[in-house]
């Protein structure tokens, strides 16, 4: 057991060294119990590009909550950690660092550059693991993986070769998205489209015979040197007679043909379209149909090449200005029309993406997508939480394009294809035998390897690997909605293809972390928050509590320091009530407490408040477990918060002082037992969310680690509706008196007469039997409880279920003000009656709702009507006083 709890909650003291202790105790490893049901999660591998942000903290907190609860519930749990090499992002970071030293990757060469990247990886992997520790993540480091590990690399090569041999991976020259900053191809989903201010540049292309000019328009005039034709619609009467003739390409005076193609829309612009097959996907298709040449006028860094004539070597955007100026000087510029249009930008480097003709490797997606779609029509489909994201997944799969998987980078999985001087190509998991072969210099898209993450980390392609057999498919994936297509969909179709099984049973989708104003956190806005700074100020438990309670599945969460203050205050409350309970524990053990609690629920010992709190605890266990199972951590947190702060701390702990400050030692032992038992159950319920503080408090009274303690379960013997109903009525009475005092500014310390009128004999007996609690909380000079109480002439009155409460206030009350208060109360009951009446008059509701739900509404109606009638009566009495 640990040392005594400090007088003040200090998260730094509580959390210091605790994580290392857990690691030393090996409590995060699978139990190895073959009789237990396995439950596995693979961590979405963070990029080794830098520190983790709040989004990572949220993502991993949710996973840790799940795995810690399942571990406590007796599952054989595995949470497998790892990191992603993040090809383009990491290479860009390392190149940026080298540029600061005046070095480029080309100065170093591939091998030495990769040495630098591995150094970067080691540096930031250590940083990430340190952050995981501060967050308290219960991962099994003995199984840590990296996407460039040899085992994972072997899986990548096998998948590539198998897909190639099936004809589902092919190499070809097509228009792709090109990042001129990173000098690599990008897939469609790595391109972010933004609305930007631009212009349509209208130009005249003169017919070769000089008889007339055709007007064309483009937003990218710098690509005109790659024009190989102009197209008109074959049905466009304006140009039918021109088909087959030539126009002269301005500046370089090159003749190009006029072709007939339906790509040209007679209703749009002039109906004449310039065709640049090497720089536009639609033009590429036109070029294929008409067997047109492909003229690439741009270098891979976004500068113009020698085919751009005098603009050779200029940046594409500088060339745009210069070309327009030249066209104007030649008389070919007709007009410039400002416009706002959508322009693709690289997700990683932020630069404008260039459509560019390039030889790349592609995955043919037709059948892979069909397999994924078909799987979602089975009973064993992947369940999305919330379910609406299944529609998002299906929509993407139904509209998927072939996936460009090659990247012109050095950091990553080098494509397992080799070429020789004879123009032959060899694709295989290992290099071909013999000399004269050169491996393809490109690497695979990072998502190609991370798509294999759930099964490659478990030992696949060795299907006899122990972890693969035991923990695959995994149980739950937690991730953000922004990478459903990037990652989730690809894991699903790759897993179905190569293992015959889906990679996980559930996908929990969370949103994005936003600032207090609802803005996405970003470097450009300067509103990003380092989770380590938050932990330093508030502790990891407070951050985890906020992150788990911030929103529902699929929703964004707004970060605020006000919410962090509230989180810290809640933990401080738990700390203080724990200190109170443990300071009054008198050496009671948890086993002794359990034995005594069993007697309490069997009504052998204890009082009604003991049975009430145990009943409510049992209900809380059921509701929290139910919501955990649905990944509704926010709902579960609200239930826990209400039980701990309101029912346990504010009511039960205060009620126990009546016993603990008495001389009855037998009753004290029972009260201490209920307090300790309830605290223990609370800590176990909280542990998945707040691992550090619960471990610290648990260590005061129990042996071992709470990490491996059993999770609370619903116990039918704890149910006691009589105790629940009675104490809730008692609370209503006390609250009513307190509220009445407050309304007329009568201090709690001032004794006052309290009259409780009830015709319910059971309630009357209950109030009398427990009048000690009423007196303790309301400070009456006189307390009368009876059905025969005469209504006082002038009194504060209130109505609770089954009783009326009067506080005679002849010397303290303004009658007119009391009458106004009652009118307000009457309006409140009328509003409640209108609402419930509207619901019960809805035939559809009555017909479709569960009978118990309808009955609950009817009970509400009866209760509200009783309160309404009693309030009417009091108003009439008060009016008599006024008269």
From Swiss-Prot:
It catalyses: tRNA(Val) + L-valine + ATP = L-valyl-tRNA(Val) + AMP + diphosphate. A motif ('HIGH' region) lies at residues 46-56. One of its GO terms (cellular component) is cytosol. Gene3D superfamilies: HUPs (3.40.50.620), Isoleucyl-tRNA Synthetase, Domain 1 (1.10.730.10), Valyl-tRNA synthetase, C-terminal domain (1.10.287.380), Valyl/Leucyl/Isoleucyl-tRNA synthetase, editing domain (3.90.740.10). Residues 809-844 form a coiled coil. It is found in: Cytoplasm. GO terms for biological process: valyl-tRNA aminoacylation. GO terms for molecular function: aminoacyl-tRNA deacylase activity; ATP binding; valine-tRNA ligase activity. It comes from the Bacteria. A motif ('KMSKS' region) lies at residues 520-524. Keywords: Aminoacyl-tRNA synthetase, ATP-binding, Coiled coil, Cytoplasm, Ligase, Nucleotide-binding, Protein biosynthesis. ATP binds at residue 523. Its EC number is 6.1.1.9. It holds the Pfam family tRNA-synt_1. It is an enzyme of class 6 (ligase). Monomer. HAMAP family: Val_tRNA_synth_type1. Catalyzes the attachment of valine to tRNA(Val). As ValRS can inadvertently accommodate and process structurally similar amino acids such as threonine, to avoid such errors, it has a 'posttransfer' editing activity that hydrolyzes mischarged Thr-tRNA(Val) in a tRNA-dependent manner. Belongs to the class-I aminoacyl-tRNA synthetase family. ValS type 1 subfamily. ValRS has two distinct active sites: one for aminoacylation and one for editing. The misactivated threonine is translocated from the active site to the editing site. The C-terminal coiled-coil domain is crucial for aminoacylation activity. This is Valine--tRNA ligase.
């Amino acid at each position: 057991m640990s040392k005594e709890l400090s007088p003040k909650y200090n998260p730094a003291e509580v959390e210091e060294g605790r994580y290392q202790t857990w690691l030393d105790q090996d409590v995060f490893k699978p139990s190895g119990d073959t009789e237990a049901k396995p439950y596995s999660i693979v961590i979405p591998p963070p990029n080794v590009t830098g520190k983790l942000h709040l989004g990572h903290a949220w993502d991993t907190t949710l996973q840790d909550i799940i795995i810690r609860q399942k571990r406590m519930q007796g599952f054989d749990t595995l949470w497998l950690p790892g990191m992603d090499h993040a090809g383009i992002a990491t290479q860009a970071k390392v190149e940026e660092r080298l540029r600061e030293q005046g070095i480029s990757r080309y100065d170093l060469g591939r091998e030495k550059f990769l040495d630098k990247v591995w150094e970067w990886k080691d540096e930031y992997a250590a940083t990430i693991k340190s952050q995981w520790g501060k967050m308290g993540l219960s991962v099994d480091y003995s199984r840590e993986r990296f996407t460039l590990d040899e085992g994972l690399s072997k899986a990548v090569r096998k998948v590539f070769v198998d897909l190639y041999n099936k004809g589902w991976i092919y190499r070809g020259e097509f228009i792709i998205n090109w990042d001129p900053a990173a000098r690599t191809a990008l897939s469609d989903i790595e391109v972010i489209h933004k609305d930007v201010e631009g212009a349509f540049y209208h130009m005249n292309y003169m017919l070769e015979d000089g008889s007339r000019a055709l007007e064309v328009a483009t937003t990218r005039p710098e690509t005109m040197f790659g024009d190989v034709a102009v197209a008109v619609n074959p049905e466009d009467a304006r140009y039918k007679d021109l088909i087959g003739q030539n126009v002269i390409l301005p500046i370089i005076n090159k003749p190009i043909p006029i072709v007939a193609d339906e790509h040209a829309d007679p209703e749009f612009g002039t109906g004449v379209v310039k065709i640049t097959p090497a720089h536009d996907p639609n033009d590429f298709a036109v070029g294929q149909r008409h067997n047109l040449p492909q003229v690439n006028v741009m270098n891979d860094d976004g500068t113009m090449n020698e085919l751009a004539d005098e603009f050779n070597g200029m940046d594409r955007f500088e060339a745009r200005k210069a070309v327009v100026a030249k066209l104007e000087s030649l008389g070919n510029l007709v007009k410039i029309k400002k416009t706002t249009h959508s322009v693709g930008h690289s997700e990683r480097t932020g630069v404008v993406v260039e459509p560019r003709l390039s030889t790349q490797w592609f995955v043919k997606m037709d059948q892979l997508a069909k397999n994924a779609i078909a799987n979602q029509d089975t009973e064993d489909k992947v369940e999305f939480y919330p379910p609406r994201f299944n529609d998002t997944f299906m929509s993407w799969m139904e509209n998927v394009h072939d996936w460009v998987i090659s990247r012109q980078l050095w950091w990553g999985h080098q494509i397992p294809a080799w070429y020789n001087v004879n123009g032959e190509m060899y694709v295989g998991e290992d290099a071909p035998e013999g000399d004269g072969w050169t491996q393809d210099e490109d690497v695979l898209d990072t998502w190609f390897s991370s798509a294999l993450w759930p099964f490659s980390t478990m030992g696949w392609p060795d299907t006899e690997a122990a972890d693969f057999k035991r923990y695959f498919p995994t149980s739950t994936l937690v991730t953000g909605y922004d990478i459903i297509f990037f990652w989730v969909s690809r894991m699903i179709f790759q897993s179905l293809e190569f293992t015959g099984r889906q990679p996980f049973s559930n996908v929990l989708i969370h949103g994005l972390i936003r600032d207090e104003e609802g803005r996405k956190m970003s470097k450009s806005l300067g509103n990003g928050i380092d989770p380590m700074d938050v932990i330093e100020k508030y502790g990891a438990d407070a951050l985890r509590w906020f992150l788990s309670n911030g929103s529902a599945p699929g929703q964004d969460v707004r970060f605020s320091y006000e919410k962090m203050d509230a989180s810290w205050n809640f933990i401080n409350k738990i700390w203080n009530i724990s200190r109170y309970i443990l300071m009054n524990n008198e050496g009671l053990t948890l086993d002794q407490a359990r034995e005594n609690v069993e007697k309490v629920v069997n009504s052998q010992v204890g009082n009604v408040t003991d049975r009430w709190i145990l009943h409510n605890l049992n209900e809380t266990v059921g509701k929290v477990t139910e919501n955990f199972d649905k990944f509704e951590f926010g709902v579960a947190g609200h239930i826990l918060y209400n039980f701990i702060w309101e029912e346990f701390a504010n009511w039960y702990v205060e009620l126990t002082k009546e016993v603990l400050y008495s001389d009855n030692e037998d009753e004290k032992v029972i009260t201490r037992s209920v307090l300790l038992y309830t605290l223990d159950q609370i800590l176990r319920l909280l542990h998945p969310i707040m691992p550090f503080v619960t471990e610290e408090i648990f260590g005061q009274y129990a042996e071992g680690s709470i990490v491996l303690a059993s999770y609370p379960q619903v116990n039918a013997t704890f149910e006691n509706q009589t105790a629940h109903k009675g104490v809730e009525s008692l609370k209503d009475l006390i609250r009513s008196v307190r509220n009445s005092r407050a309304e007329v500014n009568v201090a709690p310390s001032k004794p006052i007469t309290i009259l409780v009128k009830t015709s319910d004999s059971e309630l009357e007996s209950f109030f009398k039997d427990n009048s000690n609690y009423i007196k303790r909380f309301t400070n009456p000079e006189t307390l009368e409880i009876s059905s025969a109480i005469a209504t006082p002439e002038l009194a504060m009155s209130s109505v609770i279920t089954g009783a009326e409460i009067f506080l005679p206030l002849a010397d303290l009350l303004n009658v007119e003000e009391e009458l106004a208060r009652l009118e307000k109360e009457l309006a409140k009951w009328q509003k409640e009656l209108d609402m419930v009446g509207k619901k019960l008059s809805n035939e559809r509701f009555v017909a479709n709702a569960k009978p118990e739900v309808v009955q609950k509404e009817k009970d509400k109606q009866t209760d509200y009507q009783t309160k309404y009638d009693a309030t009417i009566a009091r108003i009439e009495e008060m009016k008599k006083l006024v008269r």
